[in-house]
Amino acid sequence: PPHQCFRRQRQMCIRDRKFVFGQDSAIDALTQAIRRARAGLRQEDKPIGSFLFAGPTGVGKTEVAKQLSKTLGLELIRFDMSEYMEKNAVARLIGAPPGYVGHEQGGLLTDAIIKNPHCVLLLDEIEKAHLDIFNVLLQVMDNASLTDSTGRKADFRNVILIMTSNVGSENIGSQSIGFSNNVSDIGSGALDKTFRPEFRNRLDKIVKFKALSVEIVER
């Protein structure tokens, strides 16, 4: 129901801060973007939201996605993109072409969305995915639909798409990954070099996570 959706959105900031420390600005940015989308300020043929979480390892990017799905009462579907670095990885996500083994089985991604059309889709370490997968994501962010190898169409209009990336984390500080005295946001230079403009321009928001300070770690 609509009143429950808005109440859950108001609760999201409070809930996430209980599990993720030192990332208030990132959580606020995500919450505002989702509120705008759910208020009808988005195109009907696009996902609810398409977000890139950028920041060092261990600062709460994946945890925020998990808590978001719990708060909104949505299924969390997660793919580790380090497993999809090869060219044939696209076939695993949307199904093998006709004549290839596994053609009748469809794809892991399309099957998951067909079964759970209302969900949070989490693609961890997206920078490791093969370039062909980015072409698939452009289709998803453009038209909120994807047709698998068997002709079935997966509808992404009620999906919150979240991708995480560690790109540029080495520039945050010289200490261990995820922990640094320098709490400034990641510069956009590394992201610009890694992700093509047509990909970045289709994102609703690049949510930048800061490195954790010593005070936050000691909580």
List where the protein language model places each region:
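Short, exposed "boundary/linker" segments that immediately precede the start
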Residues: 1-3
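AAA+ P-loop NTPase nucleotide-binding core of proteostasis motors
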Residues: 7-11, 15-219
